[in-house]
Design a protein with these regions (language model features):
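A contiguous, surface-oriented mixed alpha/beta subdomain in the mid-to-C-terminal portion of proteins
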Residues: 1-43, 48-56, 74-81, 88-102, ...
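Short acidic, gly/pro-rich beta-turn/loop elements at beta-sheet edges
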Residues: 59
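A surface-exposed, charged beta-strand/loop segment in the N-terminal or early-internal portion
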Residues: 65-67
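Non-catalytic terminal regions of proteins
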Residues: 70-72
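Short amphipathic alpha-helices in soluble, non-transmembrane regions
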Residues: 62-63, 87
């Protein structure tokens, strides 16, 4: 008989184990980092929860946008251990260059982009004993009135098996995860900007906010910035001095260049961080 599971991301729900065990109902819980080299931080990894048919946790997940951002729902007729064993194959991933890394596949945003990057014929291999993987993809935080998406992934019978290891990411998957990261980064930037510099974005419509964020990211990257810190500094200067602060002849940035010897010879990352330090120093 098929049963429901929740797959929680421990980074997004750092009180997950306390919350689950405090629910006061029969559940089975397996942190997927159990017995691995990451056992010491298992509460921050993927956590699989087996539910009974009357679980209040399932109802809470269905009604809570916040919880849907932290967990997805699986269905399977297999045991909790069998589902956990299958999912454990994805704890680390490898790309075409041979690079290994930890994979936060339990983050619904990540799983949405990752699973969506495969053709439907891949799901029989990819999902294994899982008969459905249901992911809620809420609208981005800069466009809350947009409709969210429910994405259901199911295996197709008689599909060709995936070649190679399941945790190997081809170029399509790598690109999809880059898109997931970019959306997550934009949401974090928006949350910070709307709190500290609300005047920058509050007058824009939802679509315009997304376009503004994307254009500022593009500008920062074109200028040579790579790190999150430097890109955040760039957006802060845009909020304070205008979107064209780096090119406008009368901007405070040009005045700073003129009075600060040697900074023009710094690499972009060093230069924007030196600018930030001087701004903080007043």
């Amino acid at each position: 008989m098929s049963r429901d599971f929740l797959l929680l991301d421990g980074v997004l729900r750092q009180d997950a184990l306390r919350w689950l065990y405090g629910a006061g109902e029969p559940i089975e819980v397996i942190p997927l980092y159990n017995g691995t080299r990451w056992d010491g931080v298992k509460e921050l990894g993927p956590i699989l929860v087996g539910l009974d048919s009357h679980s209040s946790l399932l109802g809470e997940w269905r009604s809570s946008l916040n919880l849907q951002r932290q967990a997805s729902k699986l269905q399977s007729s297999a045991t909790l251990n069998d589902v956990a064993d299958h999912l454990s194959q994805f704890i680390t991933i490898m790309d075409n260059l041979g690079s290994y890394s930890l994979f936060r596949f339990a983050d619904p945003l990540v799983s949405s982009y990752w699973l969506g990057s495969y053709s439907p014929s891949a799901y029989e291999s990819l999902l294994g004993p899982i008969s459905e993987w249901l992911v809620a993809l809420p609208p981005p935080n800069w466009a809350p009135s947009q409709s969210g998406e429910w994405q259901s992934y199911r295996p197709q019978t008689n599909s060709h098996k995936l070649k190679g290891k399941l945790n190997h990411l081809a170029d399509d998957q790598v690109q999809a995860l880059e898109q997931a990261y970019r959306r997550s980064f934009k949401e974090r930037l928006y949350g910070w900007l709307i709190e500290d510099y609300p005047q920058t974005l509050s007058s824009l419509g939802e679509q315009e906010r997304g376009q503004w964020l994307e254009q500022r990211l593009f500008d920062a990257e074109a200028w040579g910035l790579v790190s999150e810190r430097s890109i955040a500094i760039w957006l802060e200067r845009c909020a304070c001095w205008g979107d064209d602060f780096a090119t406008r002849s009368d901007s405070p940035y040009q005045a700073w260049l003129a009075r600060t010897p040697g900074v023009q010879n710094l690499a972009p990352e060093q230069r924007i961080q030196a600018l930030d330090e001087d701004c903080l120093a007043g």
